């Protein structure tokens, strides 16, 4: 653990970017988290990945960071977003930060599933482990300052009243 006031070394070299690496990294990280909750594994969905790519490009183009209102179209897609400094995060680090929210997860009825009392502290994680979700597709886009990761899920998770274990 770093000492107070001492920042850990950060690797500033550009991170590898490749669609095959993105797919394998995302599937592995999602399914490892899901395995811990006995949720069935997700399969990659190219249509979801295309939707994610369109939205990631829009976020990068507009330099905004907000959920896509169109993800609510029928069928409603679940969505996880990440934004970080350009080339500072590998794919594993991007998804790892979302999975790390699991440290605040507590079993219960959604949205009462956070040990902090705030569902926003676990919302990415609960979508990742959502047992009814079966498919995922992710994509990234970059602008001069940031990398954006968008993951889409079907069926969507984070449904109020559902019990998570």
Specify the residue positions occupied by each region the protein language model found:
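N-terminal secretory targeting signals
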Residues: 1-4
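Short, contiguous pre-domain boundary segments
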Residues: 6-16
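Short, well-ordered surface patches within globular domains
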Residues: 14-76
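Short edge beta-strand segments in beta-sheet-rich domains
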Residues: 76-78, 146
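Disulfide-stabilized extracellular recognition modules
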Residues: 87-165
């Amino acid at each position: 653990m770093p000492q107070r006031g001492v920042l850990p070394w950060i690797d500033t070299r550009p991170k590898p970017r490749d669609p095959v690496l993105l797919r394998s990294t995302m599937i592995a990280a999602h399914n490892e988290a899901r395995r811990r909750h006995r949720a069935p594994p997700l399969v990659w969905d190219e249509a979801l990945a295309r939707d994610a790519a369109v939205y990631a490009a829009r976020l990068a183009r507009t330099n905004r960071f907000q959920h896509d209102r169109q993800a609510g179209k029928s069928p409603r897609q679940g969505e996880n977003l990440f934004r970080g400094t350009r080339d500072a995060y590998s794919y594993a680090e991007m998804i790892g930060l979302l999975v790390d929210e699991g440290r605040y997860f507590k079993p219960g009825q959604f949205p009462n599933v956070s040990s902090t009392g705030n569902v926003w502290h676990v919302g990415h994680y609960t979508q990742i482990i959502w047992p009814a979700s079966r498919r995922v597709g992710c994509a990234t886009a970059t602008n001069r300052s940031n990398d954006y990761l968008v993951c889409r899920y079907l069926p969507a998770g984070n449904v109020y009243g559902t019990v998570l274990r």
